[in-house]
Amino acid sequence: MGLQKSHLTVCLPPSVPFLILVSTLATAKSVTNSTLNGTDVVLGSVPVIIARTDHIIVKEGSSALINCSAYGFPDLEFKWYNSVGKLLKEMDDEKEKGGGKWQMLDGGLLNITKVSFSDRGKYTCVASNIYGTINNTVTLRVIFTSGDMGVYYMVVCLVAFTIVMILNITRLCMMSSHLKKTEKAINEFFRTEGAEKLQKAFEIAKRIPIITSAKTLELAKVTQFKTMEFARYIEELARSVPLPPLIMNCRTIMEEIMEVVGLEEQGQNFVRHTPEGQEAPDRDEVYTIPNSLKRSESPTADSDASSLHEQPQQIAIKVSVHPQSKRDHVDDQEGGHFEVKDEEETEPSEEHSPETAEPSTDITTTELTSEETSPVEAPERGLPPAHLETTEPAVTCDRNTCIIYESHV
């Protein structure tokens, strides 16, 4: 009995490990099946863009390589389109010859050989598989490097520069010639015609004063000086602007100056006022200024006040009536005419000044401007001829009366 029990205990243990091994194998199989099923889901994916390129710049005549930069599983199928939407294909005969202009490489690469300026534009890559489709666009820019155009532009610039330089040199030469001619003409004008006109103006300026007193002589000198200064200014102005038409302008200006200076004024008549208590005869009511006291009759005249825009001068004329004694009357008849000294000296004005003059019956003062005068008809009887060559103060002698004119500015 004891031997049989020991044998049974030995035979039972081998069955337990077998069961454990079978169960382990079954578990491993199930785990393997589940793992394989999960792997099948992970391996499939839609296409994605892994890098984007905006544009590519290449020189004309070189090659351009454009990458689609797309990834997906299973493998993607790539197609390229140009800017007008045309599908780019590589012909079979071109493949046999080593490839044409458009070469489709693995991984979605497009190789453009011998790029021309007309190849510029946008290129679109379309990548697709069983899970989806995606596209990527790249712009191709071509640099134009033709040597003929560069030479053409250079030649055009050189020709334009040469023309401009020739025109500038010609203009400078013409200006220089005009300057010389203008200077010569101006010098000739002021040596001949201009000098004569200026000399006439100076002579007329010396005869500007119509009365002889210290103040009038000073006014004449000032006016003469201003006339000379104005003439010099005109000459300097003519020399400062070197243009040929200036010669005519200068002559016109000088002629206008002479015309302004040569304004002729009609005779000025003054009415004598009879002193109180005396009655003057009708024939002596009006006195006329002698021709010697009038302004010059020169065609160039004797005043430049209008050209200098000076204020009008006030002239006060004093008329004194003195009765003449019989003795003086006899002397006057024997002598014939009065002798009048030169008015440029100050002695006559001192002799007939109001301070040293004898008291007269009445003195009437009339103020007249050099521009506004009231002409009065002259009587039939004028002054003696001897007074036509005299200057202020003017002396008029009647039968029994001596009238002295004194003028002051």
From Swiss-Prot:
Q: Which cysteines are joined by disulfide bonds?
A: 68-125
Give the transmembrane ranges: 149-169
**Which ranges sit in the Extracellular compartment?**
29-148
InterPro entries annotated for this entry?
Ig-like_dom, Ig-like_dom_sf, Ig-like_fold, Ig_I-set, Ig_sub, Ig_sub2
Q: What membrane topology does the annotation report for this chain?
A: Single-pass type I membrane protein
Kindly list the places in or outside the cell where this protein is found, as annotated in its UniProt entry.
Cell membrane; Nucleus; Cytoplasm
Instruction: List the PROSITE patterns.
Output: IG_LIKE
Annotated PANTHER family = MICROFIBRIL-ASSOCIATED GLYCOPROTEIN 3, MICROFIBRILLAR-ASSOCIATED PROTEIN 3-LIKE
What name does this protein carry?
Microfibrillar-associated protein 3-like
